[in-house]
UniProtKB/Swiss-Prot annotation:
Full protein name: Potassium-transporting ATPase KdpC subunit
Database matches in NCBIfam families: kdpC, PRK00315.1
Its membrane topology: Single-pass membrane protein
SUBUNIT field: The system is composed of three essential subunits: KdpA, KdpB and KdpC.
Residue intervals passing through the bilayer: 11-31
One term of GO molecular function: P-type potassium transmembrane transporter activity
GO cellular component terms listed in the entry, alphabetical order: plasma membrane
Primary site of residence: membrane
Cellular localization per UniProt: Cell inner membrane
Length: 190
């Protein structure tokens, strides 16, 4: 019996050390050398060197002076990430969307873009379409007392055009660019 147990236990210990210690350390080391920014969470820093968020995770922005992210089913918490999985007929979803439409409705009476009313699959998508961002441009320009053309130029400068897929705008990067403008209100801090 001992002849059977000893090799089995030795294999368990050896494989635990390889897969639980050695492999993670090697992968972490390679990632830190080859892709240090991504390995550390794709953190975004302001001019003072303070972490303002991650380029890969959405966050909530409140106030008319900021571009708003997509809604999050998990309140932008990474632990509770994910979609609500409500059916279109679910009263809770209908109520939330109606509240969001009322909150977002602008003076131009243009329909609210769907991306500003629906959560992403993860609930943490940091990107919006240029159209959803442009829909908010008038509100942001008015709140910051900027010409609409200047805000639109900032949107164009922050629009990413991937090789595959539609153009997108990272909301955090755009808001940080807004904050770099000389006309940024004193109370408008990320």
């Amino acid at each position: 019996m001992s002849n059977v147990l000893r090799p089995a236990l030795s294999l368990i210990v050896l494989m635990s050390l390889i897969t639980g210690v050695a492999y993670p350390l090697v992968v972490t080391g390679v990632a830190q050398v080859a892709f240090p920014a991504q390995a550390n969470g794709s953190l975004v820093y302001d001019a003072a060197g303070k972490v303002r968020g991650s380029a890969l995770i959405a966050q909530s922005f409140t106030g008319d002076e900021w571009f708003q992210s997509r809604p999050s089913a998990g309140a932008f918490a990474t632990v509770a990430s994910g979609a609500s999985n409500f059916a279109p007929s679910n009263p809770a979803l209908v109520t939330r969307v109606k509240e969001d439409v009322a909150k977002l409705a602008n003076a131009s009476q243009e329909p609210v873009p769907l991306a500003l009313l629906t959560t992403s699959g993860s609930g943490l998508d940091p990107h919006l379409s240029p159209e959803a961002i442009a829909w908010q441009a008038g509100r942001v320009a008015a709140a910051r007392q900027l010409p609409l053309e200047k805000v639109q130029a900032l949107i164009d400068a922050n629009t990413q055009r991937p090789l595959i897929g539609p153009p997108v705008v990272n909301v955090l990067a755009l808001n940080m660019s807004l904050n770099q403008l000389p006309s940024a209100p004193r109370n408008a801090q990320l």
